[in-house]
Design a protein with these regions (language model features):
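N-terminal low-complexity or simple alpha-helical regulatory segments
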Residues: 13, 25-28, 52
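Nucleic-acid-binding surface
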Residues: 20-23, 52-128
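N-terminal, charged amphipathic alpha-helical interaction modules
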Residues: 31-32, 46-49, 60-61
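Charge-dense, extended regions
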Residues: 173-175
């Protein structure tokens, strides 16, 4: 009886991990372990298990992908996931989203949208966000803080940059909005 329960728990964790790899293809092991706070050894074992089963594979650059996917990571999504991971303890729900938003999550009763704005895309993304009124809080990922002055759209909670190794740095817009 006890063994079955343990296998079920393990199975649930494996299914959750597989779902995460499928929703956000290309995440590193470090990112995937952050989805399972306090259970990194279990999560590591499950990644190996899913890999041996042929359900997922690790690309040359270290990202994990579902079987059958081409190993091309969406760098903007990977940056947005680092932002999500800052809130993962409070996040009740998260999912990838449509352009210009990369992902959405619920935390503390609020809906957050994480959008990415590449250099030169400020006007385009703002235009897309204006038509996208949802009463959510928006976190805008930028390549550099110099872009912030060019971004003017509603419901922005803050801006951030994300380094290659996943360090997030948050900024408020000048003028306190």
């Amino acid at each position: 009886e006890l063994m079955k329960t343990r296998a079920e728990i393990y199975g649930n964790e494996a299914a959750t991990l597989l779902r995460t790899v499928t929703m956000y293809p290309g995440l590193s092991q470090q990112q995937l372990l952050c989805f399972h706070p306090g259970k990194s050894e279990t999560a590591k074992a499950l990644l190996s298990h899913l890999e041996r089963q042929g359900r997922i594979f690790q690309s040359d650059n270290g990202g994990y992908f579902p079987a059958g996917y081409s190993p091309k990571a969406d760098q903007a999504l990977i940056k947005a996931v680092w932002v999500l991971l800052d809130f993962i303890q409070q996040a009740d729900y998260h999912a990838p989203a449509e352009f210009p938003v990369k992902l959405v999550f619920f935390a503390d009763g609020e809906l957050y949208e994480v959008a990415y704005v590449a250099h030169g895309q400020e006007a385009l993304v703002c235009h897309a966000l204006r038509g996208n009124k949802g009463g959510s809080r928006r976190i805008i990922v930028v390549d550099s803080p110099t872009q912030i002055a060019k971004i003017d759209c509603p419901d922005i909670s803050g801006f951030c940059t994300v380094s290659q190794d996943g360090q997030t740095q948050y900024f408020k817009k000048a003028g306190g909005t």
